[in-house]
């Protein structure tokens, strides 16, 4: 796979196959012919096993990909530097390239009272 240095594709595919086998080893519980409490307990145990499988899968992938489990937090500029109006000097507020273009809103005096003449 493009862009990976040090990791072979075969190792990654092997990890994916292993995770797939883990998920297939825990099918959803049968919902027929039992009391509501028994079904609820079965679903609760199934969800607990799914959480364990999720954490094992994350550990396997992080081992093969060499990435941390938690994403790196995005560094944002301080709130004091963010502005909502971009009438003058756009791009110097520290938000250049972040988000969508800003749209200036006309004041109510310019828009009128809303009644047609």
Swiss-Prot record:
Skewed-composition ranges (Polar residues): 93-105
UniProt motif Nuclear export signal and binding to XPO1: location: 74-85
Swiss-Prot/TrEMBL keywords: AIDS, Host cytoplasm, Host nucleus, Host-virus interaction, Methylation, mRNA transport, Phosphoprotein, RNA-binding, Transport
Superkingdom, natural source: Viruses
Protein role: Escorts unspliced or incompletely spliced viral pre-mRNAs (late transcripts) out of the nucleus of infected cells. These pre-mRNAs carry a recognition sequence called Rev responsive element (RRE) located in the env gene, that is not present in fully spliced viral mRNAs (early transcripts). This function is essential since most viral proteins are translated from unspliced or partially spliced pre-mRNAs which cannot exit the nucleus by the pathway used by fully processed cellular mRNAs. Rev itself is translated from a fully spliced mRNA that readily exits the nucleus.
Comment, domains: The RNA-binding motif binds to the RRE, a 240 bp stem-and-loop structure present in incompletely spliced viral pre-mRNAs. This region also contains the NLS which mediates nuclear localization via KPNB1 binding and, when the N-terminal sequence is present, nucleolar targeting. These overlapping functions prevent Rev bound to RRE from undesirable return to the nucleus. When Rev binds the RRE, the NLS becomes masked while the NES remains accessible. The leucine-rich NES mediates binding to human XPO1.
Family according to the record: Belongs to the HIV-1 REV protein family.
Protein name, per record: Protein Rev
